[in-house]
Amino acid sequence: MAKAKFERTKPHVNIGTIGHVDHGKTSLTAAITIVLAKTGGAQATAYDQIDAAPEEKERGITISTAHVEYETKNRHYAHVDCPGHADYVKNMITGAAQMDGAILVVSAADGPMPQTREHILLAKQVGVPAMVVFLNKIDMVDDPDLLELVEMEVRELLSKYGFPGDEIPIIKGSALQALEGKPEGEKAINELMDAVDSYIPQPVRATDKPFLMPIEDVFSISGRGTVVTGRVESGIIKVGEEIEIVGLKDTQKTTCTGVEMFRKLLDEGQAGDNVGILLRGTKREEVERGQVLAKPGSIKPHDKFEAEVYVLSKEEGGRHTPFTNDYRPQFYFRTTDVTGTIKLPADKQWVMPGDNATFTVELIKPIAMQEGLKFSIREGGRTVGAGVVTKINN
């Protein structure tokens, strides 16, 4: 069956369900589509369609993710749900499924569990801006005091990891009752979507952020000067604007004297465009792949940072052995590899393949970087890990 095209007239937000295994993330995802389908805002998707999530490859890592889309009165949503805990870890660290917000699912019958904690921590580390809580399976709890206790525990846990635990909306309901079409089940889903609509902030569009373009290639065009090519990551570049060349060497200033796309001259290039940018007075040898063009002052080069990293298992084509302190692989940022040294936290002697870990990295050359930047770890051209910059240290 052909997928119905959604009219993209409403603002778009990417969200996902997170939480402990068997707390009802996939049931909730199915319930949202089934309840919203009644008002024409979704295509009803059954639990087993979502649970059979296809495998995808993101930066050399295989991740199983299910995608559904739906809309409320105010917004259009793309929603991701992962079958296994490892898929969540990989998804959040690689940014394969960008999340502007999350729905944390907690079983009222069990309360917060180890993966509940881990997902909240990961969400904080990778910069998920906001989350709403769905306290699921309330049909299995008879004692209102117990519900209150679980809610309190969840709020404390959120606060502990740096989210505003006292403010976050917590909706109580039963995904199963919603799937069965019971009115109280559906009412909770509608309440949840109202909370998601109002509490999860509208993301800043890529074109509204400062201009940034990773350099992929550099050419010299006789009589015209130096042209750099790449895909604009964020913002807009107009002819005549000053820009900086950042990373690997000292930051240089230059001016954009032309923007070209598909052999046509444009007045500007914007986020998502593959363009060639002509630089005034910049020599071919002064620019190289791995640097970025950026709005002056918007991004700085750094060589020391803290990261949250997922290390590929042997089965995924990663290392067969753990690595220890002072391990020196290549870190692939945007378009280039830079060698760096890993410093593990004092309580960790090694990191096993298949684990995720937090550690500090020192690069041999600085890279244009901001918190939230994704990278791969490579050894001789093969990906052995994926990470995200959580804190810049210098």
Swiss-Prot record:
The gene is tuf. GTP hydrolase that promotes the GTP-dependent binding of aminoacyl-tRNA to the A-site of ribosomes during protein biosynthesis. Keywords: Cytoplasm, Elongation factor, GTP-binding, Hydrolase, Magnesium, Metal-binding, Nucleotide-binding, Protein biosynthesis. GTP binds at residues 19-26, 81-85, 136-139. Residues 60-64 are annotated as: G2. It catalyses: GTP + H2O = GDP + phosphate + H(+). The keyword tRNA-binding does not apply. It comes from the Bacteria. Belongs to the TRAFAC class translation factor GTPase superfamily. Classic translation factor GTPase family. EF-Tu/EF-1A subfamily. Mg(2+) binds at T26. It is found in: Cytoplasm. GO terms for molecular function: GTP binding; GTPase activity; guanosine tetraphosphate binding; translation elongation factor activity. Residues 81-84 are annotated as: G3. Monomer. This is Elongation factor Tu. Residues 19-26 are annotated as: G1. Residues 10-204 form the tr-type G domain. GO terms for cellular component: cytoplasm. Its EC number is 3.6.5.3.
